[in-house]
């Protein structure tokens, strides 16, 4: 009986070896195909983030545009709002999109904000011929104030003191100023908000004083300089 059992075991074990080899080969082939044929992730199916550079070394960790943060759409369902300071890792285009949903009548209209950003990026590409992501990064770098003033003292004696601005607040304030400038320019104007946002980003990227964000940044830095 023992010999019969051994023969049965051998008959079941022998054909298993080539099957395992075939399965291993197919797994290796699928892994090779998946690693070599990964498609490039482009924003809205058009804009690549490979050639985008952040020239300000202090903001490189707070402007997320590298391949790791590449998305087809600027929407992550609030993933970066769960913890404090996690928004620093949020893709910069999504932060711009979320800032466009300001004022009560626009709350929660993410699809409308995505459409505005998409149209403004197409306008930027038509006017400049450059990657709109690079224009956005340059606009944020130029619009973030490096110095601000704060109130110091108690109720009786209050004075303003100039302070340096952290990199995260520079990015936050730059995005807010850019969106505010676009919103105010589009109010009671024949231009759409996508056109106004495109103009604001292009002027801010150039450092032009026609940009609302650049004017406000210069004003904040001028007040801070007088309070040193």
Swiss-Prot record:
UniProt cross-references to InterPro entries, sorted A to Z: Ribosomal_uS7, Ribosomal_uS7_CS, Ribosomal_uS7_dom, Ribosomal_uS7_dom_sf, Ribosomal_uS7_euk/arc
GO biological process: cytoplasmic translation; ribosomal small subunit assembly; translation
Keyword Repressor tagged: no
GO MF annotations in UniProt: mRNA binding; rRNA binding; structural constituent of ribosome
Keywords: Ribonucleoprotein, Ribosomal protein
Gene Ontology CC terms: cytoplasm; cytosolic ribosome; cytosolic small ribosomal subunit; nucleolus; ribosome
UniProt keyword annotation of Ribosomal protein present: yes
Protein family membership: Belongs to the universal ribosomal protein uS7 family.
NCBIfam families, per the entry: PRK04027.1, uS7_euk_arch
Protein name according to UniProt: Small ribosomal subunit protein uS7A
């Amino acid at each position: 009986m023992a010999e019969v059992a051994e023969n049965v075991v051998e008959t079941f074990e022998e054909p298993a070896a080539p099957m395992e080899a075939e399965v291993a080969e197919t797994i290796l082939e699928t892994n090779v195909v998946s690693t070599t044929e990964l498609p490039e992730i482009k924003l809205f199916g058009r804009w690549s983030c490979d050639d985008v550079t952040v020239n300000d070394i202090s903001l490189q960790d707070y402007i997320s545009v590298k391949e790791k943060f590449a998305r087809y759409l600027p929407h992550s369902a609030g993933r970066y709002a769960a913890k404090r300071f996690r928004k620093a890792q949020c893709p910069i285009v999504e932060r711009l999109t979320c800032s466009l949903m300001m004022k009560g009548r626009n709350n929660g209209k993410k699809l409308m904000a995505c459409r505005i950003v998409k149209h403004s990026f197409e306008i930027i590409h038509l006017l400049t011929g450059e990657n709109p992501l690079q224009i956005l990064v340059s606009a944020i770098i130029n619009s973030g104030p490096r110095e601000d003033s704060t109130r110091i003292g108690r109720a009786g004696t209050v004075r303003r003191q100039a302070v340096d601005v952290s990199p995260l607040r520079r990015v936050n304030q730059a995005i807010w100023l850019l969106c505010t400038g676009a919103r105010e320019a589009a109010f009671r104007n024949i231009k759409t908000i996508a056109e106004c946002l495109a103009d604001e980003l292009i002027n801010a990227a150039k450092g032009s004083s026609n940009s609302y964000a650049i004017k406000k940044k210069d004003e904040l830095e001028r007040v801070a300089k007088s309070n040193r």
